Amino acid sequence: MKLIQLSSSDIRFKPINFEDGLNIVVGQKILKNDKKKTSNGIGKSLSLICIDYLLGKGTQSKEIKKLKALLEKEQIILSLIFEHNGVTYNIKKSHNKAWLDDVLYEKDSDYIKFLNTLVRGYSFRNIFSRFFRTDKSSYNEAIKQVS
C-alpha cells in the first residue's frame, strides 16, 4: 500500500502529499531564538490520527472520539488517496459516513469488509496496527509483542 495524499474539506488543513519511499512527519521550529515557539500543535499527530481513522480504526480510542467530534462540529470530510496493487483508491470519511471512490458505505462494517479484501486471509486492521501507532498504549503494546 502506498499513501498518495491526505487532505480535508477544511481549508486550514493543508494537503499532505506522500513521496515514494519513507516519509517522515516533523515539526519545524521557525524562530530558533524564541524558546516559547515550538513545533507542538501544528498537526503531526493529528495527521496520523486522520490516516488511522480513514483506514478503519474504531471509535474506542479517545483520539478517534475527539476527531469524530471535530468532524461533526465543523462538518469536515477527510480524504485519503492511496494505491494498492496498482489500483488507486480515494477514501473519504465524515463523522458518520464513508465513501470509497464516491460510493457511499452506510455502515462501518461494510467499509471494513472492503479493507479486508485488500489483504486476503487477514484482518486489515490487525496488520495495519502492527506498523502504525498513534497513542501511548499502542507503543506499550508493541513492546509487549517483542518481549
Please place each PLM-identified region on the residue numbering:
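Glycine-rich phosphate-binding loops of NTPases
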Residues: 95-147
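Extreme N-terminal "head/tail" segments of very large remodeling/mechanoenzyme assemblies
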Residues: 1-87
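Hydrophobic or amphipathic alpha-helical targeting/insertion segments
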Residues: 84-96
